[in-house]
Amino acid sequence: MIVPINIYSDDVLRQQALPLEGVDKEVEELLGNMFETMYSAPGIGLAAPQVGRSLRLLVLDISCMREYANVKPMVVINPEIVAVKGYRSMEEGCLSLPGLQGDVVRPSSISLNYRDEHFEGQNAEFSGLLARVLQHEIDHLDGRLFVDRLQKKERRKVQKELDALASGRFIASYPVVLPVKVNKA
């Protein structure tokens, strides 16, 4: 089932996501919904907070890109980056920030401990686009968005677009959840 994606300024995107203790039917259903939503948008990565669930869980699939056609879709649960190497700037976008892009500097390769869709422990090295997408999605699990990593000059360039997103003035080609602001009296 395609589920709506939470948009910039929604509180769930700023929370530290909770670790999972296992994979049950509910998590399996969530994973299926996340893949379907990601493919429909279309996107190449999606973290649970982006669909309103504050859990340390993400899915990704970069096989739509010719040079990564042999990379299988991934489920990553409770990820922990344990080592990084090199740095590279690259343009990023995000389904929670429709229409917005910016250059982000990130490590070009990472070593990652995580659990797979069977909740089996894994440790692997990732580089290039796969490392970038993993880091981008892990940021979501830590309550961080790619715009938080922009250089000040770059951030100033996109501030009007961020303000428009926060106030609901944007166009998305996929279902979204608009943030609700609660007045605290």
Swiss-Prot record:
EC number of the protein: 3.5.1.88
Family matches, as Gene3D superfamilies: Peptide deformylase
The keyword Iron belongs to this UniProt entry's keyword annotation: yes
Pfam families the record matches: Pep_deformylase (PF01327)
Cofactor remark from the record: Binds 1 Fe(2+) ion.
GO-annotated molecular function: metal ion binding; peptide deformylase activity
Binding-site residues, Fe cation: 94, 136, 140
Reactions mediated catalytically: N-terminal N-formyl-L-methionyl-[peptide] + H2O = N-terminal L-methionyl-[peptide] + formate
GO terms classed as biological process: co-translational protein modification; translation
Cofactor: Fe(2+)
Enzyme class (EC, first level): hydrolase
Keywords tagged on the record: Hydrolase, Iron, Metal-binding, Protein biosynthesis
InterPro entries: Peptide_deformylase, Peptide_deformylase_sf
Location of the active site: 137
NCBIfam families: pept_deformyl, PRK00150.1-3
Task of the protein: Removes the formyl group from the N-terminal Met of newly synthesized proteins. Requires at least a dipeptide for an efficient rate of reaction. N-terminal L-methionine is a prerequisite for activity but the enzyme has broad specificity at other positions.
Assigned protein family: Belongs to the polypeptide deformylase family.
Record-linked HAMAP family: Pep_deformylase (MF_00163)
Name used for this protein in its record: Peptide deformylase
Source organism of the structure: Chlorobium limicola (strain DSM 245 / NBRC 103803 / 6330)
Gene this chain is encoded by: def
